Amino acid sequence: MCIRDSFYDEVLAVLGMSSMYEDEVCIGYAHEGNPDVEFYITQPANGEPVTFGNGTQISFLTKTKEQVEKFHQIALGLGATNEGNPGFRPSDSNAYYAYIRDPDGNKICAYAYQ
């Protein structure tokens, strides 16, 4: 499949997700032990080049702040850019976030409640 690369395979593995479905135009990821796909990467149906959305963000709820930190670390090691270091936001809340932009420019967030 032409859109497959190891970035999402490795980053989503931190969250307990793996590819569960793949065909000529898309790949779907689900949590281990659950056959329901929660995240798809697809080629545009209109045949135009892939672009990222301005003002869009994909967020993944994790179980622990350690998963958030590992997600951030692995993503940066695979070529993502930092959009926000792991930390509580706001600083006095129980919500722990980290933000990256994947190699294509999509803004991705991993977060956990502690």
Regions flagged by a language model, labelled:
Residues 43-45, 86-90, 114:
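Short, well-ordered turn and helix-capping elements at secondary-structure junctions
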Residues 60-104:
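Vicinal oxygen chelate
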Residues 1-6:
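Conserved small/polar residues in nucleotide/adenosyl-binding loops
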Residues 15-52, 108-112:
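Conserved short beta-strand elements that form part of the metal-binding/catalytic scaffold
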Residues 12:
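Acyl-CoA/ACP chain-elongation machinery
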Residues 16-23, 59-61, 71-72:
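A broad, low-specificity signal for short, low-complexity segments enriched in glycine/proline
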